[in-house]
Amino acid sequence: MNDCLFCKIIKGEVPSYKVYEDDKVLAFLDVNPNSDGHTLVIPKEHYENLFTTPNEVITYMIDTIKTKIYPILKDKLNIDGLTICQNNFYGQDIKHYHIHLIPRYNSDKFKCTFDSSVVSDVKDVYEKLKNE
């Protein structure tokens, strides 16, 4: 895609702080991080979201996170944990599939919580979802 920011980063048209790169994926620091080392992992081919990305690409990305990128973050930044998140459609600012790796530190104040008071009763939701 010509106007995709992440495609421009892959092509080298926009600078980035690369953490890891191979022929299929690129991992780089998020310029609006939630913690030190907040990294975005993207496929080098353009797919808009999880649902348009081939399973083998997703599998490769997850394996690369586990075996290549996480060890870099752990060894270089001495992280205590890792929050992994990914948005589709609503909440997805860049329409190029990407996974957020948010390093966690024992001293951080980052919380991944939502206001459950605005959510429907779990029994009502279950009734809508269960098979008849």
Could you describe each region identified by the protein language model?
Residues 1-132:
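HIT superfamily nucleotide-processing domains
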